[in-house]
Curated annotation (Swiss-Prot):
Domain of life: Viruses
Source species: Hantaan virus (strain 76-118) (Korean hemorrhagic fever virus)
Protein's name in the database: Envelopment polyprotein
Gene: GP
Region annotated Binding to the ribonucleoprotein, chain positions: 516-533, 588-605, 592-603, 611-625, 1122-1135
Keyword check for Disulfide bond: yes
Motif YxxL, chain ranges: 615-618
Amino acid sequence: MGIWKWLVMASLVWPVLTLRNVYDMKIECPHTVSFGENSVIGYVELPPVPLADTAQMVPESSCNMDNHQSLNTITKYTQVSWRGKADQSQSSQNSFETVSTEVDLKGTCVLKHKMVEESYRSRKSVTCYDLSCNSTYCKPTLYMIVPIHACNMMKSCLIALGPYRVQVVYERSYCMTGVLIEGKCFVPDQSVVSIIKHGIFDIASVHIVCFFVAVKGNTYKIFEQVKKSFESTCNDTENKVQGYYICIVGGNSAPIYVPTLDDFRSMEAFTGIFRSPHGEDHDLAGEEIASYSIVGPANAKVPHSASSDTLSLIAYSGIPSYSSLSILTSSTEAKHVFSPGLFPKLNHTNCDKSAIPLIWTGMIDLPGYYEAVHPCTVFCVLSGPGASCEAFSEGGIFNITSPMCLVSKQNRFRLTEQQVNFVCQRVDMDIVVYCNGQRKVILTKTLVIGQCIYTITSLFSLLPGVAHSIAVELCVPGFHGWATAALLVTFCFGWVLIPAITFIILTVLKFIANIFHTSNQENRLKSVLRKIKEEFEKTKGSMVCDVCKYECETYKELKAHGVSCPQSQCPYCFTHCEPTEAAFQAHYKVCQVTHRFRDDLKKTVTPQNFTPGCYRTLNLFRYKSRCYIFTMWIFLLVLESILWAASASETPLTPVWNDNAHGVGSVPMHTDLELDFSLTSSSKYTYRRKLTNPLEEAQSIDLHIEIEEQTIGVDVHALGHWFDGRLNLKTSFHCYGACTKYEYPWHTAKCHYERDYQYETSWGCNPSDCPGVGTGCTACGLYLDQLKPVGSAYKIITIRYSRRVCVQFGEENLCKIIDMNDCFVSRHVKVCIIGTVSKFSQGDTLLFFGPLEGGGLIFKHWCTSTCQFGDPGDIMSPRDKGFLCPEFPGSFRKKCNFATTPICEYDGNMVSGYKKVMATIDSFQSFNTSTMHFTDERIEWKDPDGMLRDHINILVTKDIDFDNLGENPCKIGLQTSSIEGAWGSGVGFTLTCLVSLTECPTFLTSIKACDKAICYGAESVTLTRGQNTVKVSGKGGHSGSTFRCCHGEDCSQIGLHAAAPHLDKVNGISEIENSKVYDDGAPQCGIKCWFVKSGEWISGIFSGNWIVLIVLCVFLLFSLVLLSILCPVRKHKKS
């Protein structure tokens, strides 16, 4: 059993251990494959492996794209290592020595000339690795460069390197061709170097990876450019290493060749490589706090067979953070150096005995522009108990969320549009989706209508055309649908249902009448018995038998007891009983004729006759009469038609449109007309009336006031880009020499701070192999790496809330943009914004984590001058300044233990400001934006959520000259052009109207979308002389509605029918387009309007499909036949 136990345990543990060695490499692909030799790159840092195992490592790929064969060749490296001398017991400059040997490494990133270009044309990948090593182990970094076509060909594949397996995952971003930075799509533009157009072009920090390519030639003498560009004393540049760096910017670009004088990107990378040659560190997670000991400076022979030392290095022990692969500079031939546990000299102020990095990673600042943000289209269909939705955007979706749906972060793509699928679990309320900064509302009522239509059509699939025509009427939500069902059922089956339902009602009524009659007879008998008993007790005495003690109801019964009980007989059945009270009482309980005296009395009481109007009348009612059935049938059809028409128009909540009849309301101007109300920032407001002369009603003037939605405009100061970064605390210790003697790798980081503890005088702060007190140095270094831009910040200087107000008063047409505490004033009308309730204030900072169209956060406290690490705005890159580093206010402490290496401790904050904000993001105020316009100095947008409110006051004076202003010469002609959408109360329809204006240059008015009875929507529009195209959106109507374009009481002669609501996808409505308050005072639909609407519906339902009428008449005939069978006409015989 023991061996089986271990085998089972091994089978359980082995898959877990195998999975632990699988790591992900993400390759970010653009949305579309652009022209040009673009390549994409990805890399991943892997855990350490023993130094001895590096000689056998080689990348092995299972990807269907072949790896470039030249990487499989063996590259000879000079391995430089250090070791302590056996005769030295204490650390000093002479206590160690370097050893140079030749090793063969296969698969390192030694790229050949034209390799990347050839791999693009031959559709091959370039897979290689870098090594960061100390004296015992190495941390590999795996790189993969593939042509951009791989984004369309592959989804994932697997690469093996040593003991590790790397899953390569291709992820598409929503960027068309650009690089995803700060949630925005940045396109580097090398043609823009010095002139940055405000609001169009910007400067962004972009990640870059460079590989050295060794090639000989006069044009590849890289150190000639080093000598020109930097203050270098490099001599004999003719005999220095020759070649160039090939770089990929942002993970997705065409190759950039470094140095290239006419390419700004190339020179930025060239500057970064030689000013910060170590580049980004290769620390893994958890290695932010580490230490290493400096052993001392050393020289080595490269190659190992050289007669003299050719390379300077610094030996160390501890966690390796930087690449151990480099290229010797003192030879035109590329001499590859592998230096585990040593920092090669990469400073080229003096080019003697130096090297250059084989692979360099870092960040460079590039000019470019951001891709435009495209609006979203959201569709939904009913799926099970919920809805299945899709979101599309031509230019990609940068952000999509929903408070009531399950939106996956894994994006899928279809052709040139990005498609994101998600599921909404409930459809009992409208679905709200935020997509690309827009608030979309999907009206789920239409989805339910579609499912209802689909179900009814499926049940009556033998006649699908008829079933669909009837289903679209039955499935209208609310009382209207039930009224329609009742109307159709009454028409088709009323001749059977009316007598059947009447019979049921009569049966119930007769049953109730019978119950009441029986109850009354019993109560009358009980009353008689009670009176007899009371009278007997008053005159004769008790009615209780002396023998059996039974209480009698009548004197005759008492007399019978007096005769039979003494003789031991039952007075009712004359059965013999024991002459005891208990025996008699027990017998009476089982005796069957104890009620015979009561029955005799009941016969003597005269029964009460039925009244003619109750039970007898119910029995004689002729519910089978054809006259009664026909009368009820007609009455129900008329009543249900009125109820149907009354329920056909829905009254939604404001600020959405309210259905009303034709026309415009009128106001007699006895006094000044004043309106005072609060209006949300996302709402438009339209007020339209006829102002009439109170002395003569025939004189009137048209008043039309249009107030557009609020525009928020802020003058800002662009603070720049906010960065996230990782703070590293490193301890560098060496036994001898001053702290300035060695150059530490963090010196080339953009943000670093160092505290030195030099020449210690305590034995407790020196390891056992140090020479003693008063020597050496402990350097404590703080530096930031893995910098990543996360957002753009803008400080509000001034803020302005404004609305555009237009007034049409008779012939007068005036418009003005008014601010808070400002007024529009004309001769007769005054419109003022008295105040605004807002969450913005001067001095706030607006932070955008992505495109400005997606909204942002409001910061009341944002550091701009003295920033500490961890504050909002701690790491900034302003456009007009250099990189701004934060302060590190914490203090250092050197922790000492006897005979051990000192360790640096830092008591300050180690968490970046960005990570702190994300951890508490719910505590910050957010805002959404739409209709965004921005430059570096000003941002304007509209609030789609209506979170702000304006207090508005409108005053119209009563002093109007009706005699001179009453005549309006403007003439309007109407024509209905086309219609889109569906009738009903779902998403609605859009009516296209051709409106002609003559006799005046401009005219502000409203065009309505109406049928014969009711108007369902309106659009306020400023007409110009000539032909105008106006689109009017509305909701409502029925299958018979013929929608026309109307102006007041005048409508176009020809109307159009809208489609029926069905199971098609429901398109989301932009909230900013749907939020408006329209008030023209038109009357509500009355009784006459109801009859007009019913007639239009009845004519409409039959005009388009005559077979529906035929089918309904067939059902009517069937019900008549069924009535004649079940209820035949009663024949009367002649006497």
